[in-house]
């Protein structure tokens, strides 16, 4: 509470003596190796897209400018030009083109569609998904969807990217919604 009253938002461009302590705390809490804090959800998703593409070119060996990221119909990841490029919301898209290429849309909560998209090309870099879709009308996937989607991504060397902006930090009863059925020791609250 005291910190929230002193400084709640800062950029990594400016030094503060709390960021390192926060990063240590949050990585230990979630069992992560690293964290890159962002100020907004759209900034977090844009950064995830950039990291995914960079990884695809430098680690997976996809030819430059050929990486594809799978996204779901009915998604809401923000309102930036890149993000609206793969949105179904015509109110968000109208008169903002041309749009950013490099995305494949599939049905949400459809493992067959995900597998078909992943195996359709050697240029698949990542799968960006909301653990619970909010913009589409609060759509909760089947109980095994996220775990099976992650396993499918791992089996095909595709990054699994969960957008927890609207669902994370215990908003769904789990620290992370993607861990709703988690049994990972020291990785979440269960």
Report residues per predicted region.
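Conserved N-terminal phosphate-binding loop of PLP-dependent enzymes in the Aspartate aminotransferase
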Residues: 1-190
